[in-house]
């Protein structure tokens, strides 16, 4: 099977490539990325350079939203990848989510509508007046119509208990911490308690 993983930034793609679950395919030179910098080459030496975003059987291709959307615009009728994974999908415009559907036979959107939405440099009045709201809502627009199954993670492995207690304001108390990290009290450092 061929897999495309797409995200807003190259840094996000490097985070994906750095996951321990991918170490074997990285070492076997089965992970390709567009536009590898010298720092990225040092960080993950076995990462392969991908000049054109093309499916490779048994491999993972990493490309930004910008690069992936360019490929989608060039497609005629074929769907090149078996799977497309859109990481940080809450940051994608609706057009990018649509492009992902053109690129993959199966598509997984990984994102959280409670997190950073797409960054748009238009005034809200212009968005409203030109009827662009659905376009800039991105993942919200896709998830609100009920056309696909949704899953909400309830455990965080990065956030310690204190951080989860603040974050739970947005998650109605449904998030719990599984982090092994513990918060150290630092004298003379002030925190606003979540209860006010």
PLM features per residue range, with description:
Residues 23-25, 75-76, 142:
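Alpha-helix termini
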Residues 45-50, 69-74, 94-96:
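A generic local structural motif
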